[in-house]
Amino acid sequence: MSSQGFMSKIALPYAEALVESASSASALDQINQDLSLISEILNQSQELKTFFYNPLITTEIKKNVVSSLFTNQVHSLVIRFLLVLIDRRRIALLDVIISKYLELVYQLQSTVIAEVLTPVLLTDVQQSALINKIKDMTNSKTVKLVITIKPMLIAGFIIKIGSKTIDTSLYGRLKHISAYLNAVS
């Protein structure tokens, strides 16, 4: 089993518990925003990430930092959840837990996450059209686009929804032609 699969197995019960707690408190949207904020902060601050993941730093110090950083910034449920993760020495799995949490919430809300790779930024009209097309394809209520700019695609785009990939990029077409020509010769 890969380490990512192992971490996902450990993270899933925590994510499920958080979804249940957030749902009971009627705070799913607020918790989503708060976890996105925390994830963004951790991605921007390597020092903070290293601090939380360091097993040599005591749980008390980590708890104090969480309290000072996030009190009055995020929902109290999120703070309590972070403190539980620190107590159980699972704070190093926070990224995976947040990812699993969002997956579960999006499933609950019939939301599909579509990763879109494009060479240029899509306009609002293009994004709306893409969202509508993905809604039709997946029969979902809502679609969340995660757009990444990849200039090497030249033109077109790549859409990843779960394990499915739709590649309409010029780069993908050229790669396909190259593979065909290499196979023929």
From Swiss-Prot:
It comes from Gracilaria tenuistipitata var. liui. SUPFAM superfamilies: N-terminal domain of the delta subunit of the F1F0-ATP synthase. It is a peripheral membrane protein. The keyword Transferase does not apply. This is ATP synthase subunit delta, chloroplastic. F-type ATPases have 2 components, F(1) - the catalytic core - and F(0) - the membrane proton channel. F(1) has five subunits: alpha(3), beta(3), gamma(1), delta(1), epsilon(1). CF(0) has four main subunits: a(1), b(1), b'(1) and c(10-14). The alpha and beta chains form an alternating ring which encloses part of the gamma chain. F(1) is attached to F(0) by a central stalk formed by the gamma and epsilon chains, while a peripheral stalk is formed by the delta, b and b' chains. One of its GO terms (cellular component) is proton-transporting ATP synthase complex. One of its GO terms (molecular function) is proton-transporting ATP synthase activity, rotational mechanism. Pfam families: OSCP. The gene is atpD. It is found in: Plastid, Chloroplast thylakoid membrane. Belongs to the ATPase delta chain family. F(1)F(0) ATP synthase produces ATP from ADP in the presence of a proton or sodium gradient. F-type ATPases consist of two structural domains, F(1) containing the extramembraneous catalytic core and F(0) containing the membrane proton channel, linked together by a central stalk and a peripheral stalk. During catalysis, ATP synthesis in the catalytic domain of F(1) is coupled via a rotary mechanism of the central stalk subunits to proton translocation. This protein is part of the stalk that links CF(0) to CF(1). It either transmits conformational changes from CF(0) to CF(1) or is implicated in proton conduction. Gene3D superfamilies: N-terminal domain of the delta subunit of the F1F0-ATP synthase. Keywords: ATP synthesis, CF(1), Chloroplast, Hydrogen ion transport, Ion transport, Membrane, Plastid, Thylakoid, Transport.
